[in-house]
């Protein structure tokens, strides 16, 4: 089986899940899968995908896994107790044929607390099933050579002594074995340049730092859970701060675009949060705007961290590191370019929350193609409320 541990997912799923347990235990949500890569035929593999998801739903956390989660400073004991009883409910996931030729349809609907852990392993399953059928003889040597070239861009440049990169590629990895090789190789060869991984299982197994804070779904759900739509981003950040009391302090900035984020990210949040994460739009413009915003709020940017994670490559990350050197702390999360770069085109697949408590939710990011919503009227209303230009 592809997924053999419920820890084989990204850390931010657990940090969000703990907030859901403590603040929104009754929330009901719906997620929908989408493949953005044209011309991909996944239908021949439907039965394989269903079998893998069935096996996923039989998994439980082991005692060793629960102890590891409990050792993380921000994970509370009642959450670990809850996870000791947890399994993914198979009745909440539906897998079938999509509307377009070759397309598959995957939806997840049910309690947020019980369905939040579906997304990452399901995407990893779709990826691995597809590639093990279409790339039966992967060019491992090509992949290893590409990885070495990337690492040496950093290792061979003394000016990049402070460069830190994390592996963020669970959902779009070529395979779990290749994923593990990437993490073990980076740990062995990059030393302090390797900040860690978003994958909790690999962090535990290789004794590296698990990394992650919040994802888009958290801020999207707060559109339905907060007091009113206009205040939903502030509400989400305040609930996060109430839960973590200053820990896990990287705010996600692109659910409503940078303009709306800066309007809401006032002096209080500037001081309270450690920094922000970029995930769409021009990263250089975004970084400069954020630094200016900190200065305008009388906060020294040198004490803050800018995290870049949008479709990053090593050359792009190095360029960003040079631009912001000495002006703030920077960190980089590289996903697909690490875990699925063996010389073929990776799949652009996502699984996004589309409803919470019966109402539509959406991300209106700085990259229009990333917007995913099944209700155009709601999307138009969201743009109006957050003073965003029409699509």
Swiss-Prot record:
* Xref: CDD domains: PncB_like
Question: Which top class of enzyme applies to this chain?
Answer: ligase
Q: Which protein are we looking at?
A: Nicotinate phosphoribosyltransferase
- GO function terms (MF aspect): nicotinate phosphoribosyltransferase activity
Pathway named in the protein's UniProt entry: Cofactor biosynthesis; NAD(+) biosynthesis; nicotinate D-ribonucleotide from nicotinate: step 1/1
Gene3D superfamilies linked to this entry: nicotinate phosphoribosyltransferase
Keywords recorded for this protein, A-Z = Ligase, Phosphoprotein, Pyridine nucleotide biosynthesis
The lineage is: Bacteria, Pseudomonadati, Pseudomonadota, Betaproteobacteria, Burkholderiales
Output the superkingdom of the source species: Bacteria
Which family would the database say this protein is a member of? Belongs to the NAPRTase family.
Q: Does the keyword ATP-binding apply?
A: no
Q: Which reaction does it catalyse?
A: nicotinate + 5-phospho-alpha-D-ribose 1-diphosphate + ATP + H2O = nicotinate beta-D-ribonucleotide + ADP + phosphate + diphosphate
Please name the InterPro entries in this protein's record: N/Namide_PRibTrfase (IPR041525), NAPRTase_N (IPR040727), Nic_PRibTrfase (IPR006406), Nic_PRibTrfase-Fam (IPR007229), Nicotinate_pribotase-like_C (IPR036068)
**Mind telling me how this protein is modified after translation?**
Transiently phosphorylated on a His residue during the reaction cycle. Phosphorylation strongly increases the affinity for substrates and increases the rate of nicotinate D-ribonucleotide production. Dephosphorylation regenerates the low-affinity form of the enzyme, leading to product release.
Task: List residues modified as Phosphohistidine.
Answer: 216
Function, as annotated, reads:
Catalyzes the synthesis of beta-nicotinate D-ribonucleotide from nicotinate and 5-phospho-D-ribose 1-phosphate at the expense of ATP.
**GO CC term, one of those recorded:** cytosol
GO biological processes: NAD biosynthetic process via the salvage pathway
> Which EC numbers does the record give?
6.3.4.21
């Amino acid at each position: 089986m592809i997924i053999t541990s419920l820890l084989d997912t990204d850390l931010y799923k657990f940090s969000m899940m703990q907030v859901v347990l403590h603040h929104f235990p009754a929330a009901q949500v719906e997620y929908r899968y989408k493949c953005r890569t044209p011309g991909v035929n996944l239908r021949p593999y439907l039965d394989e995908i269903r079998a893998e998801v069935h096996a996923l739903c039989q998994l439980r956390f082991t005692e060793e896994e629960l102890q590891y989660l409990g050792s993380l400073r921000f994970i509370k004991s009642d959450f670990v107790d809850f996870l000791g009883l947890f399994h993914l409910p198979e009745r909440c996931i539906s897998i079938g044929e999509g509307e377009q030729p070759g397309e598959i349809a995957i939806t997840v609907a049910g309690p947020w607390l019980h369905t939040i852990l579906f997304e990452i392993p399901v995407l990893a399953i779709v990826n691995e099933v597809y590639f093990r059928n279409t790339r039966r003889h992967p060019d491992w040597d090509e992949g290893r050579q590409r990885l070495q070239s990337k690492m040496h861009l950093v290792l061979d440049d003394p000016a990049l002594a402070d460069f830190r990169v994390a592996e963020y590629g669970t959902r779009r990895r070529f395979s779990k074995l290749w994923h593990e090789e990437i993490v073990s190789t980076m740990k062995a060869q990059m030393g302090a340049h390797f900040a860690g991984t978003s994958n909790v299982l690999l962090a535990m197994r290789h004794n590296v730092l698990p990394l992650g804070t919040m994802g888009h779904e958290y801020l999207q759900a707060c559109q339905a859970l907060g007091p009113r739509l206009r205040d939903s981003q502030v509400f989400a950040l305040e609930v996060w701060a109430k839960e973590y009391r200053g820990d896990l302090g990287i705010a996600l900035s692109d659910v409503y675009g940078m303009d709306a984020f800066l309007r809401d990210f006032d002096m209080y949040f500037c001081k309270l949060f450690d920094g922000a994460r970029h995930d769409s739009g021009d990263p250089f413009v975004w970084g400069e705007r954020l630094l200016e915003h900190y200065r305008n709020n009388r906060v020294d940017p040198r004490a803050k961290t800018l995290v870049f994670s949008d479709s990053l490559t090593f050359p792009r990350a190095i360029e960003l590191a040079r631009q912001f050197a000495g002006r703030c702390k920077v960190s980089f999360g590289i996903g697909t370019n690490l875990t699925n770069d063996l010389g073929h085109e990776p799949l652009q697949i996502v699984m996004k929350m589309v409803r919470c408590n019966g109402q539509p939710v959406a991300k209106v990011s700085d990259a229009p193609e990333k917007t995913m919503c099944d209700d155009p009227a709601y999307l138009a209303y969201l743009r109006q409320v957050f003073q965003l230009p029409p699509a």
